[in-house]
Amino acid sequence: MNSRNKLAEMPIRPLLYTMAVPLMLSLLVQSLYNIVDSIFVARLSETALTAASLVYSIQFLMIAVGVGTAVGLNALLSRKIGEHKPEEACRAATTGLFLMIFTSLIFSMIGIFLSDTIATKLAADSELQELCKQYLSINLVYCWGIFLQTYAQRLLQAVGDTVLSMLSLIIGAVLNIILDPIMIFGLLGCPAMGVRGAAIATVIGQIAGAIAALLFNRFRNPIIHVRLKNYHFMWQDVADIYRVGLPTIIMQAIGSIMTFVVNRILLDVSATAVAFFGIYYKLQNFLMMPINGLGQAAIPIVGYNYGDKNYQRVQQTWKILLPTGAIIALCGTVIFWCFPGQLLQLFSASSEMLLLGIPALRIISISFVMSAITILCGYFSSGLGNGIINMVGAAIRQLILLVPCLWIFIKISGISHGWYAFWIAEIIACIYSYYMSHKLLKTICK
């Protein structure tokens, strides 16, 4: 069954699951190499782990721009294919490539000229500043690897080929995991480079994944091809990409702002609290990768059938998507509740971190189901061409309510009660996202 027939005719449940499983696996592997980075860096020192946690907010901002642009492009391509306009899809894909290259150049310039300045803003301690600068400058200067990798993967996803998208991610992730201990600790004749080695291993993995994804598109993508000959740039393509992409960028950037602000709040508590939050955020991201894989699989299904005016299949996707995500999130809650100490020990947690982190993981994990519903509602509405619901839901759960509630609770009752801020933020965001997405669905499917 070809890509068009699969998106139009295959029963929704097996279609969603067969597309989602490769994406889940690839995203889990991608998240795993972030965790492996932290595990190896933690063996250097808690200071090195704190530096990696502080830099993560800036990395996340960079990734936000790439992922947001790619999500907008993915939604546009799926609709064009559903409308049976392959030439317009190819033109949009070419425009998307230029946008990715331009954006990566901007971040590379930031890495070359502003890494020192950013490091001084992230930390006051001179040792922390130096470690932050080492890790950050390499990731920014060579960011074109992650931008091209994200772009090429979304072209594959737009035509329903999540298996090759998965393989490209796995290639980069496995290479990163192999290179991490070699470059950090100086194995096999390689000089020990510490935090700098972790950053180099990361960008090499990203570049390898980008090359693989681009080659897969060149030889295995049956519909979408980048065509420079007779290419005509159209601002309408840019507008269509960022109609969904800009809210997604803002949504992702909110996560970056949140981690930066929360780290500043937690620095007033202790450096251990900052290191713990960095660990939690990567563990939580690992859990949410299956949720994100499910949501990313839904975008081309919803976008194609919306473009094809097959609204019944859009409704079926909605009815299957949310319960599946809730079950996955519930499994994560059980794991975090039952094994918090074991999870923290993966990162060589000190006794102080265990004392702080075990109750924190248990408290926060209660909100995972609500978080999953918010995320999936955002992906679903993005597939319908509405990125605002995604953006506002993310703003509520990660910034508007979480940050002030966390600050207030810590000031009033201490750090042990601060984690309850996650409950308030996730409940309100879940209610908003479900209501608005369901309302959008009813409007479209009248």
PLM region spans:
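Short alpha-helical transmembrane segments in multi-pass integral membrane proteins
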Residues: 1-20, 77-144, 190-246, 302-367, ...
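N-terminal transmembrane alpha-helices
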Residues: 7-39, 43-44, 60-72, 76, ...
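Interfacial/gating helices of multi-pass transporter permease domains
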Residues: 18, 41-60, 127-131, 195-196, ...
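Transmembrane helical elements of multi-pass membrane transporters/channels
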Residues: 18-37, 138, 149, 172, ...
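Helix-terminus/linker motif at the lipid-water interface of multi-pass membrane proteins
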Residues: 28, 32-50, 119-126, 182-193, ...
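Small-residue-rich hydrophobic transmembrane alpha-helices
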Residues: 49-109, 146-165, 276-338, 371-393
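Hydrophobic transmembrane alpha-helices of multi-pass small-molecule transporters
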Residues: 61-64, 176-181, 210-214, 286-289, ...
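Short runs within selected transmembrane alpha-helices of multi-pass transporters and secretion channels
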Residues: 70, 139-157, 165-173, 198-213, ...
